Amino acid sequence: MGESRVKVTLRYHEFVNGKVVISRDALAMLKKAHYGVYGHATVELCHWTKSALTGGPSCYKVKFYGAPVGGSHRCVEVGPVGMMCSNKCIYCWRPSESFDPYEPGYDEVMSPEEIINGVLRERRRLLSGYFGHSRSSRGKVLEALQPTHWAISLSGEPTMYPRLPELIKAIKALPNTKSVFLVTNGLYPEMIERLWREDALPTQLYLSLNAPNRELFYKIANPVIHRDDAWERVLRSLELLSKIPTRTVVRITLIRGWNTMEDLIPQFAEVLGIGNPHFIEPKSYMNLGHSVYKLTKDNMLRHSEVREWSMMLLKALRDRGMDYVFMDEDPNSRITVLQNMKRYVDRWIEKPTNP
């Protein structure tokens, strides 16, 4: 990663003065979908941000971990390399068929400061309409303009951004930042190593693990970069999760008919033992966005089924000597969370007043 030359034909990006940017056609598509775009970075007001702005509930992460501090309206969901990814996952609700499998070089990308300033400007634009919203108070919008939390997890794979350690450090240095979450598909363990080595680990690192073996991984994740050793890279990332000095989570997206079969649960437990994460989040696939062209509503689980699967996983983990407990659940998001008691960390980043 990091060579400054084009190795693939870019469909949704172009070069301007040597820097990669989202192309005009892709920009129009993203703007129509209510994204903010700056260069190669993307930002969005997610469902839970909009809900919190208009008096509704916040994201399950507030309930589970107390982040974003103050509520979901104070979250910045950002993709530092929007529409670039190493995988084309079958369940992705982003337009992954519109992603370029390209690893940008250091000299081809914007600086962290450019990303932060551009993303915050675009986010202010997206928030501006809420000043006149009938169900949103001016105070809520003003709070939203002072974000406490950054979720580096939007369109694209963030660990493909070669200046990610600098970006996380710069975000942490902002006066209102309380937490930074990073979500990765695990294909770039070398970036996780860099984050650790350069003292730039996020507050909480998520790894998406949606298959317990190599064969199923290739069917679900469909890696297009590092295809020959993609599964081995995920395993290396899991090994790093067991060592790095920050909070770690493995999220499992459950897709009926693909990875929910009972005979796969012991395999999941075995692979999870490599990462030994602080938390495990089994969550139902949701038939939203562009995933509707690949999967159906029948592939979704009811929350009761997610809970039942989680309890079976809990037993399989304990059978292998791992001491996890059922920590919490959120039926609205069809998600549960298991907590590691041997590798214990307090669940709260900052305990909410009304968790």
Outline where the language-model segments fall:
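Auxiliary Fe-S-binding modules of radical SAM enzymes
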Residues: M1-G66, S242-P245, R256-P355
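Short cysteine clusters
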Residues: V78, C85, C89-C92
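N-terminal [4Fe-4S]-dependent radical SAM core
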Residues: S4-G82, S96-I115, V119-A144
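Surface-exposed beta-strand-to-loop junctions
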Residues: I90-Y91, P95-P101, G289-S291
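Conserved AdoMet/S-adenosylmethionine-binding subsite of the radical SAM
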Residues: S136-T296, L301-S304, E308
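Short, acidic Gly/Pro/Ser/Thr-rich loop/turn segments
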Residues: C85-K88, F99, R214, N287, ...
